[in-house]
């Protein structure tokens, strides 16, 4: 996924998020990238709400709790905001 490494560096160095938070965002974005790859999507501009909902549903069925799902959504939102600025 385009810009993922730069985004994580931005979180660590410019936003000064804790290493644990950056690691959690990395895992969340990895899960997001895996979900997109399942649909043959490698360009973040091609993502729509159905892809995100599919990921949320899948992660919920895998036992991810509500707070973790909220963090996943936050990671995705933050990633897209970062891409819009870049």
Can you say where each PLM-predicted feature lies in the sequence?
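A detector for short, charged/polar N-terminal pre-domain segments
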Residues: 1-2
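N-terminal core-binding DNA-recognition domain of tyrosine recombinases/integrases
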Residues: 5-20, 26-86
């Amino acid at each position: 996924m385009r810009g993922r490494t730069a985004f994580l560096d931005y979180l660590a160095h410019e936003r000064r998020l804790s290493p644990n938070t950056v690691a959690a965002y990395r895992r969340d974005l990895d899960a997001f990238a895996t979900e997109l790859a399942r649909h043959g999507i490698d360009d973040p501009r091609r993502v729509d709400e159905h892809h995100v909902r599919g990921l949320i549903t899948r992660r919920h069925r895998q036992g991810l709790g509500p707070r973790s799902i909220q963090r996943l959504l936050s990671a995705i939102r933050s990633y897209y905001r970062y891409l819009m600025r870049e």
